């Protein structure tokens, strides 16, 4: 059995798991999974996320507003993300008010997934205002923040430098140099299947440069299954391939990678 595996970033509430969600989750502990942080991205999926967190003692939750949730439905297209916030029509302030009561739930350990995504046609001013508000909320609640950063390094880093929240930079895709100064602020760095893809040289350099004590493992499941199963539906058991890759890059045993990253996850989530 591989492990201990702590998946710091999962989306088991996604429709891709509708057919076998509970059977799959029931099977994970036997595969070495000791923890999962299930991520909400808006008020619509938060009840489903919390249902999972309360059903399984080893599942915790992060509650926030993903930047894609500000997309208008007509901007999504067949190949784009699903329009996730329709309840409030992209009104992020109303969305935050709707989420506020959930942060009192003891299973909610972080604010997120939130951040900036400049790949999709979401107005930057709205994204920046929302992300800043969520950082301030995380500081107020004394909870870590789960940072989404896609094609937005400079603006994400500027806000992280200004406010210096604790938390995880999800699916880290920046340079090794940037990772090192972010690490000095106490941030952790999530690596998942994407770091195993051919050509992921920046990820390899960042992994090599960072101390193992500031790395955490993640899937972003059902997305980003690692090599050699890329293109399939991902789940937390497949983190074993990510752990093996990181062990190879850092020249340590896979057992040490799993042990230390699970310890890191518990530390950042204050478990």
Each PLM stretch: what is its role?
Residues 1-271:
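Mid-domain alpha/beta scaffold segments of enzyme catalytic cores
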């Amino acid at each position: 059995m591989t492990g201990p595996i702590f998946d710091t970033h999962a989306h088991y509430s996604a429709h891709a798991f509708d057919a076998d969600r509970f059977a799959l989750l029931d099977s994970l502990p036997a595969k070495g999974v000791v923890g999962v942080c299930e991520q909400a991205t808006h008020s619509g999926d938060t009840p489903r996320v919390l249902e999972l967190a309360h059903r399984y003692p080893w599942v915790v939750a992060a509650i926030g507003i993903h930047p894609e949730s500000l997309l208008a439905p007509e901007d999504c297209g067949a190949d784009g993300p699903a329009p996730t916030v329709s309840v409030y029509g992209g009104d992020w302030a109303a969305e935050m008010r709707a989420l506020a009561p959930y942060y009192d739930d003891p299973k909610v350990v972080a604010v997120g997934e939130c951040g900036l995504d400049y790949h999709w046609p979401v107005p930057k001013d709205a994204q920046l205002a929302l992300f800043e508000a969520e950082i301030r909320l995380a500081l107020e609640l004394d909870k870590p923040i789960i940072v989404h950063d896609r094609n937005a390094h400079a603006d994400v880093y500027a806000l992280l430098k200004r406010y210096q929240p604790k938390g995880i930079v999800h699916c880290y895709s920046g340079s090794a140099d940037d990772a090192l100064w972010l690490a000095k602020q106490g941030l952790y760095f999530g690596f998942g299947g994407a770091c195993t893809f051919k050509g992921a040289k920046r990820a390899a350099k960042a992994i090599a440069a960072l101390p193992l004590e500031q790395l955490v493992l993640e899937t972003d499941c059902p997305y980003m299954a690692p090599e050699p199963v890329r293109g399939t539906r991902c789940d937390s058991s497949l983190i074993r391939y990510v752990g093996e890759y990181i062990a190879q890059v850092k020249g340590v045993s896979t057992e040490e990678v799993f042990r230390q990253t699970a310890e890191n996850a518990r530390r950042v989530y204050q478990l």
